[in-house]
Every structure is written in structure tokens, then in C-alpha cells.
Design a protein with these regions (language model features):
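Alpha-helix boundary/N-cap detector
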Residues: 2-6, 10, 63-66, 70-73
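Short linear motifs in intrinsically disordered
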Residues: 22-25, 37-45, 83-93
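Generic recognition of long tandem-repeat/solenoid scaffolds
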Residues: 30-36, 50-55, 95-102
Length: 153
């Protein structure tokens, strides 16, 4: 079993302990997909990559990229902080989506912007901002995350 899958399985185990039945996992064709009911958070393990996302924005982590620990940190940052998603619309067409993590210090980190090339550029731009509350208190899972980061999975 590759390291990406071991990390996915360990995160799944921790989330099921903390969030119970809200954690939904689907396995299909050597891939696993996890989402949390009522949330935009998701992650998957396929093609030897751990993919962590919130809404449409996502990041790929892998042993090959030497960034698996960053994947663990990103996962728990998304779960333990407020998330801000800003959609930019022209008419009824969304042409850009930005996702940010808002940390307790009020600092924000842009974790991704997705833009679409075809949109009615002549129409007025509307900006819609949505706030998603943290799913887990950091203090409730911090010890387990530190252990996971320091493990030899």
C-alpha cells in the first residue's frame, strides 16, 4: 500500500472518530473519495496522489512531489478554520472562484483560484462571498495531527 493511501486511511479514521456518520467514503476502481456531509470539504486518493479540496479548488499531494506532509496540514487547516469562497459572476455565469482559509489571526491564505475562459465579459460583474465555519476545533484534533505528521506511515 502506498504512503498516500496510508495517509488517506489515517485521516479517514480520525475524521470518523471526530465527526462520525457525517464522513462519507466511496471506493471505486482503486480510488477512494471522502466528503463530509453538509460541507464543501473533500479528499480523494487516486493515481498515487492525495487530492485535498474545498468546493471546486483542490491541490494534489504525493510522495513524488515530496509534499505529503503539506497535504496533511492543508487537510486540517481546511477542517479547523473558517473558509471563504468568493464567486465572480457575469450575468448568471460564474467565471472565477477564489477559495481562502481564514486563520484565527485574521490572516487569510488563498489556496486556489479557478477561472473559466468563456463567459459574457460585457455583463456587469457580481461578487458573491460565502463563509463556511470550521468543522472541527483545532484543539480537538491537534495531538493526532502532530502524531500523523511525525509517523513513518
Amino acid at each position: 500500500v502506498n504512503k498516500n493511501l496510508k495517509i488517506f486511511d489515517e485521516i479517514e479514521r480520525l475524521l470518523k472518530i471526530k465527526l462520525g456518520n457525517k464522513v462519507e467514503v466511496v471506493e471505486e476502481n482503486d480510488s477512494k473519495y471522502l466528503q463530509i456531509e453538509g460541507s464543501e470539504f473533500w479528499m480523494s486518493n487516486d493515481f498515487n496522489e492525495l487530492v485535498v479540496g474545498f468546493g471546486i479548488n483542490h491541490t494534489h499531494f504525493s510522495e513524488d512531489y515530496d509534499n505529503l506532509n503539506l497535504g496533511i496540514i492543508r487537510t486540517f487547516d481546511l477542517l479547523t478554520n473558517e473558509i471563504i469562497i468568493t464567486e465572480y459572476k457575469k450575468g448568471e455565469t460564474i467565471f472565477k472562484v477564489t477559495t481562502e482559509i481564514k486563520f484565527p489571526s485574521a490572516k487569510t491564505e488563498n489556496i486556489g483560484t479557478v477561472s473559466f475562459l468563456v463567459f459574457p465579459f460585457w455583463k456587469k460583474t457580481k461578487r458573491i462571498t460565502s463563509h463556511y465555519q470550521k468543522l472541527i476545533e483545532k484543539s480537538d484534533i491537534e495531538t493526532e495531527v502532530i502524531i500523523l505528521l511525525n509517523s513513518d506511515l
